[in-house]
Structures are given as C-alpha cells and as structure tokens.
C-alpha cells in the first residue's frame, strides 16, 4: 500500500510551539501529508519565516495568556475553518530541583506545559463534538514517567500532561475524540543545544544525555513528528488514551 493510500483527507491541523524543534518537524510532516497546517508560536519572527516556507497559516500566541489563546482560536475558525487535529506541543523547562525552584518558575512551566492545553482543548472540543469527533495529540515526555535531576517542575508538568490526556479519552472517546500523548526521550532540538552550551562541560553533558538512550543516540524531531502523524492518521484509530514512548530504550530498564 502506498503512502498516499494511508493519508487522511486534508484536515485543519493546529500545532503549538510550531516555529522550531518537534513542532516545526510536525508542521512539515502534516504539510507534506496534504493537511492545512496552522502554526502557533510566541516567536513571531521565526514563525513567519517557517510558515512561509510551508505556505501555512500562522498566528503569534502567548500560551500563558488565556485571552490570547481564545482570540487566536476564534481567528482560526473564522480564517481557516474548524479544527480537526490539535497538536499541543509547546513546552518549556527550568533547570532546578524543588528547593532551588521559584514559584514563578513552577507557575510558568505549568502555564505553558499544562494550563495552555486546558484552554486550547476547550477552544476546539465543542466544535469537534458537534461534528462527531476529532483528534488531539499532546507532547508529554519520558520525564513524566521517570524522575530527572534538576527538572522538578518539568517532570511534574509532563506527568500532568499524561493524566490530562487520559482524562480526555475517558470523557470523550465515546463521542469520537481520540486523545493520545507522545513521550519522547532526549531529542536533538535547539533547546537541548542551549542546555549543552551552558553546561560546565558540554562534551560530558552531551555524553550523559546520549547514554540515557540504550542505543547511545538522541532522537530527531522528525522521528517524534512521525509518531504524532501516526496517532493522527487512520492507522492510529485504535490508539486512544495512550502514552507512546519514543525514547531509544531509556525506560526499558
């Protein structure tokens, strides 16, 4: 069977954190698959460039601001159409254990990683349910499954994403909603590059991050994007409420 035969009919796909990393790779994957991609990010300059390259629609949005999210999704429905697939991908992390974390660090991490999903999902769910269903894919992390040193807020927020995803399935699967999460291991994104650049010993830090995976390699944004694409495709129909681990074997032992 050809790749074309596996492609779903063109849909409106909204992706947050779409200007770089996993979000950008996911935008490219869905655009290649023939979908109408709507890219959201707070980095307006980068977003405009990347969206133009894909001939995609883009909106600058502050995911820490409920009013910004609501206005953006109202504009999407007016300008593009009803959302068929929502990919909640945007995320941030702070390098701190609990005692060295500030409340602002903790709150902002949850605002971007978790609370934004409350607002984005509420913005699309009513329309999805009226039309008989829809697809939501949330980017969690293996950090939501295992503890990582100096990532207290990040680990906790990603565990919350997994729980939130399961609750969506429990509440709405019988009405046609498919909600799943992806849990990547260490992925070679710009964010990881910044962590390495500020490390006391970048070479040792890179080695330790690579060795988390049993194959000794980081994943690529494109590999995670392929998993997100699968979960949103007809081939992923039977997956619902799942947390797909893509971690090079990190959590196998």
Predicted regions and their residues:
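Short, small/polar-rich loop/turn modules that mediate ligand/substrate recognition or access, typified
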Residues: 173, 178, 239-241
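Substrate-binding pocket helix/loop in short-chain dehydrogenase/reductase
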Residues: 97-98, 105-110, 209
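C-terminal substrate-recognition "lid" of short-chain dehydrogenase/reductases
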Residues: 118, 217-246, 251
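Short, flexible catalytic-loop segment of classical short-chain dehydrogenase/reductase
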Residues: 184-194, 198
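Residue(s) in the substrate-gating loop at a strand-loop-helix junction
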Residues: 141
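Conserved glycine-rich Rossmann-like NAD(P)H-binding loop of the short-chain dehydrogenase/reductase
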Residues: 33-47
């Amino acid at each position: 069977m050809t790749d074309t035969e596996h492609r779903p009919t063109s849909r409106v796909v909204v992706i947050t954190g779409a200007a770089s990393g996993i979000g950008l790779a996911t935008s490219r994957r869905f655009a290649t698959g023939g979908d109408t991609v709507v890219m959201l990010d707070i980095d307006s300059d980068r977003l405009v460039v990347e969206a133009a390259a894909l001939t995609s629609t883009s909106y600058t949005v502050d995911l820490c601001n409920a009013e910004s999210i609501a206005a953006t999704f109202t504009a999407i429905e007016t300008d593009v159409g009803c959302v068929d697939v929502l990919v909640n991908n945007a995320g941030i992390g702070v390098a701190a254990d609990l005692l060295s974390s500030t409340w602002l660090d903790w709150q902002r991490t949850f605002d971007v990683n978790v609370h934004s999903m409350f607002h984005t999902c509420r913005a699309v769910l009513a329309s999805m349910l009226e039309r008989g269903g829809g697809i939501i894919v949330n980017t969690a992390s293996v950090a939501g499954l295992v503890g990582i040193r100096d990532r207290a807020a990040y680990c906790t927020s990603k565990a919350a994403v997994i729980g939130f995803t399961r609750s969506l399935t429990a509440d709405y699967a019988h009405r046609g909603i498919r909600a799943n999460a992806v849990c990547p291991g260490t992925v070679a994104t710009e964010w990881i590059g910044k962590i390495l650049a500020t490390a006391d010993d970048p070479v040792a830090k890179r080695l330790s991050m690579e060795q988390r995976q049993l194959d000794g390699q980081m994943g690529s944004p494109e590999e995670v994007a392929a998993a997100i694409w699968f979960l949103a495709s007809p081939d992923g129909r039977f997956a619902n409420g799942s947390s797909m681990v893509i971690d090079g074997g990190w959590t196998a032992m």
